[in-house]
UniProtKB/Swiss-Prot annotation:
It is found in: Cytoplasm. PANTHER family: SSRA-BINDING PROTEIN, TMRNA-BINDING COMPONENT OF TRANS-TRANSLATION TAGGING COMPLEX. Residues 1-29, 152-175 are annotated as: Disordered. PROSITE patterns: SSRP (PS01317). Pfam families: SmpB. It comes from Koribacter versatilis (strain Ellin345). Gene3D superfamilies: 2.40.280.10. GO terms for molecular function: RNA binding. This is SsrA-binding protein. Required for rescue of stalled ribosomes mediated by trans-translation. Binds to transfer-messenger RNA (tmRNA), required for stable association of tmRNA with ribosomes. tmRNA and SmpB together mimic tRNA shape, replacing the anticodon stem-loop with SmpB. tmRNA is encoded by the ssrA gene; the 2 termini fold to resemble tRNA(Ala) and it encodes a 'tag peptide', a short internal open reading frame. During trans-translation Ala-aminoacylated tmRNA acts like a tRNA, entering the A-site of stalled ribosomes, displacing the stalled mRNA. GO terms for biological process: trans-translation. InterPro entries: SmpB, SsrA-bd_prot, SsrA-bd_prot_CS.
Length: 175
């Protein structure tokens, strides 16, 4: 009579692993699609966000909007301004203000880099996405330079040409 071999445990999670799928990796909570359309994105940085409890729950519900948001270095601290996080429905009277200014958590060295980059002519700090990483809310902040109208048109032309080329290749493969 043969014995069953031991199961392969290399593909299973360890016993103490968190069961929450949000806590086990990265999950986008909000993406600023207008950022790549309106700006040239140069450098990207990851920053933590100082939030209140109801804000985290609203972000988990998908109520974050980064469309008009920007970053600002004030008194050697980095702030996220105009980021809209909708109110949490199940909260009581002490819900958060949707457009409050939120502190971004980065190292002092990165703050100085961001300050130098944002002080260059035409450069600003734009949040490109908000996401969960190991259960914590993070913001991807990009140093950006504004696009002119003709830059936007050129980008649209390039996207259209690339799409047409991909479609032509796909059609030629089918026949």
């Amino acid at each position: 009579m043969t014995r069953n071999p031991q199961p392969d445990r290399s593909k299973t999670a360890p016993k103490n692993a968190k069961r929450d799928p949000v806590a086990s990796g990265e999950r986008d909570a909000s993406v600023n699609r207008a950022a790549s359309h309106n700006y040239f994105l140069l450098d990207k940085y990851e920053a933590g966000v100082a939030l209140r409890g109801t804000e985290v729950k609203s972000i988990r519900d998908g109520r974050a909007n980064l469309k008009d948001a920007y970053g600002l270095v004030k008194e050697n601290e980095l702030w996220l301004i105009n980021a809209h996080i909708g109110p949490y429905d199940a909260a009581s009277y002490n819900n958060h203000a949707p457009l409050r200014t939120r502190k971004l958590l980065v190292k002092k060295r990165e703050i100085l880099k961001l300050l130098a980059a944002s002080q260059q002519k035409g450069h600003t700090l734009i949040p490109t996405r908000m996401y969960f990483k190991n259960g914590r809310v993070k913001v991807e902040l990009a140093v950006a330079k504004g696009k002119q109208l003709w830059d936007k048109r050129e980008t649209d032309r390039r996207k259209t040409a690339d799409r047409d080329a991909r479609e032509a290749i796909a059609r030629s493969r089918k026949s």
